[in-house]
Amino acid sequence: MMEKPEGLKLIDENGRRIDGRKKYELRPIKMKVGVLKNANGSAYIEWGRNKIIAAVYGPRELHSKHLQRPDRAILRVRYNMAPFSVEERKKPGPDRRSIEISKVIKGALEPALILEMFPRTSIDVFIEVLQADAGTRVAGITAASLALADAGIPMRDLVAACAAGKIEGEIVLDLNKEEDNYGEADVPVAIMPLKNDITLLQMDGYLTKEEFIEAVRLAIKGAKAVYQKQREALKEKYLKIAQEVEESE
């Protein structure tokens, strides 16, 4: 988080934010499932100005015997930001941040997967950020979870994610880029709504105990709204398949 330029107001006296949203309002979100033919499962998400695609391959045999687990599959996650995804061109390939976020996303997704059904195999998840606008980890988790469901991987529940944060002393939902850059805190959360389980909880910045509790509650509420959009995206795909089958008969 950076020092805020003089005169920049992230939230006005009417509670309107820099992009016109209210304090507890999500950015516009669009999701589509089954966007890549060559992957076992895939999903595309637009969340604000974020554009992210996720692909899943597997379960497939692990040829490196030393990596195999005799009792379960292993989940491998690669999160990557395309060089053109941000205003200042970044070097191709993984950097420290991408490696850290890959681990975070793996930890958020793993509790939802029934990996014991596929011993000695790997499930590989690739997340490519095509355009970045704050909140890429929660959008990446959301897209990856959809792609895993699309691949038919047995799951206890979908994983939905959202962040809350603090700007100019106010707890708000779903920070955009300016708010993330110049705000005081960011709290990404991932949940399995059916089980009421939290699979990811992080905090960047400074909050009081009361503010932290408020931010977590707000992020969970946001994630539940995201979960409904995930379900709608999956439903849309399978209704389309059913329609195609019906028409071909």
Curated annotation (Swiss-Prot):
Gene Ontology molecular-function annotations: 3'-5'-RNA exonuclease activity; RNA binding
GO biological process: gene expression; rRNA catabolic process
Keywords from the UniProt entry: Cytoplasm, Exonuclease, Exosome, Hydrolase, Nuclease
Record has Metal-binding as a keyword: no
Keyword match Nuclease: yes
GO cellular component, one term: cytoplasmic exosome (RNase complex)
InterPro entries the UniProt entry points to: ExoRNase_PH_dom1, ExoRNase_PH_dom2, ExoRNase_PH_dom2_sf, PNPase/RNase_PH_dom_sf, Ribosomal_Su5_D2-typ_SF, RNase_PH, Rrp41
Enzyme Commission code(s) on record: 3.1.13.-
Subcellular localization: Cytoplasm
Record's function text: Catalytic component of the exosome, which is a complex involved in RNA degradation. Has 3'->5' exoribonuclease activity. Can also synthesize heteromeric RNA-tails.
Family: Belongs to the RNase PH family. Rrp41 subfamily.
HAMAP family: Exosome_Rrp41
Quaternary organization: Component of the archaeal exosome complex. Forms a hexameric ring-like arrangement composed of 3 Rrp41-Rrp42 heterodimers. The hexameric ring associates with a trimer of Rrp4 and/or Csl4 subunits.
Protein name as catalogued: Exosome complex component Rrp41
Organism of this sequence: Pyrococcus horikoshii (strain ATCC 700860 / DSM 12428 / JCM 9974 / NBRC 100139 / OT-3)
